[in-house]
UniProtKB/Swiss-Prot annotation:
Its EC number is 6.1.1.7. Belongs to the class-II aminoacyl-tRNA synthetase family. It comes from the Bacteria. Keywords: Aminoacyl-tRNA synthetase, ATP-binding, Cytoplasm, Ligase, Metal-binding, Nucleotide-binding, Protein biosynthesis, RNA-binding, tRNA-binding, Zinc. InterPro entries: aa-tRNA-synth_II/BPL/LPL, Ala-tRNA-lgiase_IIc, Ala-tRNA-ligase_IIc_anticod-bd, Ala-tRNA-synth_IIc_core, Ala-tRNA-synth_IIc_N, Ala-tRNA_ligase, Ala_tRNA_ligase_euk/bac, DHHA1_dom. NCBIfam families: alaS. GO terms for cellular component: cytosol. PROSITE patterns: AA_TRNA_LIGASE_II_ALA. It comes from Ureaplasma parvum serovar 3 (strain ATCC 700970). It is found in: Cytoplasm. Binds 1 zinc ion per subunit. The lineage of its organism: Bacteria, Bacillati, Mycoplasmatota, Mycoplasmoidales, Mycoplasmoidaceae. This is Alanine--tRNA ligase. SMART domains: tRNA_SAD.
């Protein structure tokens, strides 16, 4: 077999199939376009699905590609096996209604034998047991008959349950006995046992049937070919190296990391296993793999965050950092070095990796994320150090480190192993799963009903929503459900769900909150507190304590003021989106938005937090657009027409599913597809104030705006009241004798004629007053603490023995701690023991002079263990200073009795 670089193999693949009249398709972004079923492009065919489904006409019936992909379902196998990756390249050749089995098989053989010069005796193939044609074709070409394995449906039939499907044939390469240490031989491939000897390098799927969803199969009129060959696998066998991670692409990355570590990678460890070297190799493999995925993902527009693909990216980076620590790399220079190595190795094909602007962006985002986690890591490590009890890490602390500080669980395991600390991973796992269940339950809402409730799925009645109407006089009840979504004929003073033939209630969608209001029947009013869309688009109204019957006619009245506020906020959100892209950066990507009566929030990704100056400029431009009094136009067109006129379709996959013309909202330069309610003119918004721009995680931001004179007046008043309450809370129990501080407080507390124009000044004065109070309180507490320490010392100094014990009640343990620290330096041979009764707990401290303890071989851990045993408590510390506690306050007398028996001998 020819020894080829990864780049050479890819080039030969593309050129070979181009010679067979295939059109080369450039690799697409890892972020799927308009495919909500995927977080990442995860196969070579993922980007071609619309061609195979017939939604889009392919540019040619024969296609070839080398598509980058990410899969994270096997993340914990990366580095443990020879071939698992998160990022990989899939070589593919495809026929869309053109050639079929014969050509696909013949060309696969030709490429492997004539181009790569593989010895035919090294090839083994699997075929579907009923696919005689494929079996015979392989024999005709020269594959040894005994090396063709007939397999059942589970192994060699591609079927997703509904839609195109068919048999497949897999090509395996025999790497020889050195990759079969147990000398199992052909049984490995015959019985499909995971192994490194027989490596699958190519899979050809013959899409020739349609499954109707009930396993009834019919021949497709248009038969297709879908193939996939793993580039990294072919490179591994071509270069004759033990694992994919030893091939040229990975080794360049590994070498870039090695320069910063005293630990070196050794590919010979595969044949000569060594536990220590295996851990080192594992670290290098995972770093190389995860960094490839990270660099390409960021280049394609992904940003680390706490949700969806951003969360996966963050997880990959943090897992990498754990293993960088294992290699004892203590600086951050490795980040840029790895990015440069990946760009150098793969930039000839992925040319954008050599673009200076792209490289700078990747390095900036990556370094920022690494530095962010470094800080979090240090905070978490401090918690870890302070939480170890009896060489054991509590499951609650483990959970906190994972959930709050983002520690990968493998980092906790590694630190615990290094410190010889026990950690109950099973208890943590159970707790984590319980937390996930609670989180899911808390997030469960009517959207779950929409997708899973059978009654709603089968609801097939005509119901019309009227955008511009606030009151509908003659709405007919056409469907009634009780609280359990069971169809009923009536509700009798109970909660339930109602569908009308016509409604003016907006249903929650597109981030816009539903209307609230009343169903009016004669002289009765029933409150509607929620409205959502059923799967078939009807508006379903949740009503409280209602008495209603099927086919009754009622009046519907929404909360008009709330609707007008939401409408203004939704219109303002469109303007904000436009301004962000034109004032801040065209790279802004919307993550979500929420429109309420009192505010609007807008979530977006951007590599840096917008500055105060940028936000001020943004606000000024927004208000200029409001004052421009643009007409808000409602247009109707199909998706292609909308895109042709420049309409932004930020959730295009949703719009593709809708039938008929789509609703397009245009106001001045802003034009978007949207199903929400809007003002008629931008001047109806009155005024926009950006009140917050907060981080939602690295690279993810949320802008909050308030609009309209009345809402702004209420907002500034409520903000002032909140600030004043916080200030008054800080002042409690403070005897302020500082005139300047009193003047500052009085000026704030008696602020008159406050308006939204005072927003920045209010924040400034609040921050100044709050900090002044905090500083005063710190000094106040410091003085109190000094006196408390003196009082505690005096309490102990009334005793003249070399063992002094005292029971405190509701005393600050920190003051006791500091008092004992001073006492053991002033009393060289005395043991001090304190018990502090606080909140149904006992906290105990034992302290003795360090030098005295060392000289006399005293270890207070022996004494505190005795207290822990009696009271079922926990605690420990240094030989001369230990602390612990118990929730069993009733054990105090027993503790005092045992302490009384202790003898301290010099």
């Amino acid at each position: 077999m020819l020894k080829l670089s990864t780049n050479e193999i890819r080039k030969k693949w593309i050129e070979f199939f181009e010679s067979k009249d295939h059109l080369f398709i450039e690799p697409k972004s890892l972020i799927p376009k308009n495919d909500p079923t995927l977080l990442w492009i995860n196969s070579g065919v993922s980007t071609l699905k619309d061609y195979f489904s017939g939604k889009v006409k392919p540019p040619h019936k024969r296609l070839v590609n080398s598509q980058k992909a990410i899969r994270t379902n096997d993340i914990f196998n990366v580095g443990l096996t020879s071939r698992h990756h998160t990022f990989f390249e899939m070589l593919g050749n495809f026929s869309i209604g053109d050639y079929f089995k014969k050509e696909a098989i013949d060309w696969a053989y030709e490429f492997l034998i004539n181009v790569l010069k593989i010895d035919v005796k090294k090839l083994w193939v699997t075929v579907f047991e009923d696919d005689q044609f494929t079996n015979d074709e392989w024999i005709k070409l020269g594959i040894i008959k005994e090396q063709i394995i007939k397999c059942n449906r589970d192994r060699n039939f591609w079927d997703v349950g509904n839609g195109p499907c068919g048999p497949c044939t897999e090509i395996h390469y025999d790497r020889g006995e050195r990759f079969d240490p147990n000398k199992i031989g052909s049984k490995l491939i015959l019985e499909d046992i995971e192994n490194d000897r027989y490596v699958e390098i190519w899979n050809i799927v013959f899409s020739q049937f349609n499954n109707d969803g009930h396993n009834n199969y019919t021949e497709l009129l248009q038969k297709n070919i879908d193939t996939g060959a793993g580039l990294e696998r072919i490179a591994c066998i071509s270069q004759d190296v033990p694992t994919n991670f030893d091939s040229d692409v990975f080794m360049r990355i590994t070498k870039s990391v090695e320069q910063f570590s005293e630990y070196k990678y050794d590919m010979n460890e595969y044949f000569h296993p060594n536990v220590t070297q295996n851990k080192i190799n594992f670290a290098y493999k995972v770093i190389a793999d995860h960094m490839r995925a990270t660099v390409f993902a960021i280049a394609d527009g992904a940003i680390p965050s706490n949700k969806e693909r951003g969360y996966i990216l963050r997880r990959l980076i943090r897992r990498t950092m754990v293993l960088v620590r294992r290699l004892n790399i203590n600086n951050l220079l490795w980040v840029d070095a790895v990015v440069d190595a990946i760009a150098s190795t793969m930039g000839d094909f992925y040319t954008y990796l050599k673009d200076e602007k792209t490289l700078t962006k990747i390095k900036m985002i990556l370094n920022k994320e690494v530095q962010l986690f470094e800080k979090t890591l240090q905070l978490g490590l401090n918690i870890f150090e302070n939480s170890i009890r009896n060489q054991e890490l509590d499951k609650e602390i483990t959970f906190k480190l994972v959930d709050t500080y983002g520690f990968p669980i493998e980092l906790i395991k590694e630190i615990c192993e290094q410190r010889n600390v026990k950690v109950d991973l099973e208890a943590f796992d159970a707790m984590f799963k319980h937390h996930q269940l609670i989180s899911k339950a808390n997030k469960a809402n009517l959207k779950v009903m929409e997708s899973q409730n059978e009654s709603l799925m089968q609801l097939d009645v005509d119901s019309t929503f009227h955008y511009e109407i606030f009151r509908w006089e003659n709405a007919k009840i056409i469907t009634l459900f009780n609280e359990d979504f069971e169809l009923v004929d009536g509700l009798d003073h109970e909660d339930g769900y109602v569908v009308f033939d016509n409604t003016c209630f907006y249903a929650t969608s597109g981030g816009q909150q539903h209307d609230t209001g009343y169903i009016i029947k004669n002289d009765q009013q029933f409150f509607v507190d929620d409205v959502f869309k059923a799967p078939n688009r009807q508006h379903v109204h949740h009503v409280k304590n209602a008495s209603l019957s099927m086919n009754e006619h009622v009046i519907l009245q929404i909360n008009e003021q709330d609707r007008k506020s939401i409408t203004a906020n939704h219109t303002a959100e469109h303007l904000l989106h436009y301004c962000l892209k034109h004032v801040l950066s065209p790279d802004i990507k919307q993550e979500g938005a929420a429109k309420y009566p009192h505010k609007v929030t807008f979530d977006f990704t951007y590599h840096a937090q917008p500055t105060k100056a940028q936000l001020d400029k943004l606000e000024n431009v927004l208000n200029e657009m409001v004052q421009s009094n643009f007409d808000v136009q409602e247009l109707h067109m199909d998706l292609d027409e909308a895109k042709a006129v420049g309409a932004a379709a930020y959730f295009e996959d949703v719009y593709k599913k809708l039938k008929g013309k789509l609703r397009v909202i245009k106001m001045g330069p802003s034009i978007e597809l949207c199903g929400g309610t809007h003002a008629h003119h931008t001047s109806e918004i009155e005024r926009i104030k950006i009140v917050e721009c907060a981080s939602k995680g690295a690279g993810s931001w949320r802008i909050t705006m308030v609009t309209g004179h009345d809402n702004l007046a209420k907002y500034i008043h409520d903000l002032y009241v909140d600030y004043l309450n916080e200030i008054n809370h800080l002042k409690v129990n403070l005897d302020i004798n500082d005139h300047k501080l009193n003047d500052l407080y009085n000026a704030f507390a008696n602020w008159k004629n406050l308006s939204i124009d005072d927003y920045d000044l209010l924040n400034e004065k609040f921050a100044e007053l709050k900090q002044s109070l905090i500083n005063f309180k710190i000094e106040f507490d410091k003085q109190n603490a000094k006196q408390a320490i003196i009082d505690i010392k005096n309490t102990f100094n009334t005793q003249l023995t070399n063992k002094r014990v005292h029971v405190f009640k509701n005393t600050d343990n920190k003051n006791i701690f500091n008092a004992l620290n001073e006492l053991i330096n002033e009393n060289q041979d005395t043991l001090f023991i304190s018990f502090n009764l606080d909140d149904n707990k006992i906290q105990y401290l034992l302290a003795i002079n360090e030098k005295f303890a060392t000289t006399n071989q005293i270890n207070l851990n022996k004494y505190i263990k005795e207290l822990n045993t009696i009271s079922n408590g926990k605690g420990g510390g240094k030989p001369y200073f230990v602390q612990g506690g118990t929730s069993e306050q009733e054990k105090l007398d027993e503790l005092l009795t045992v302490v009384d028996k202790w003898v301290i001998n010099a």
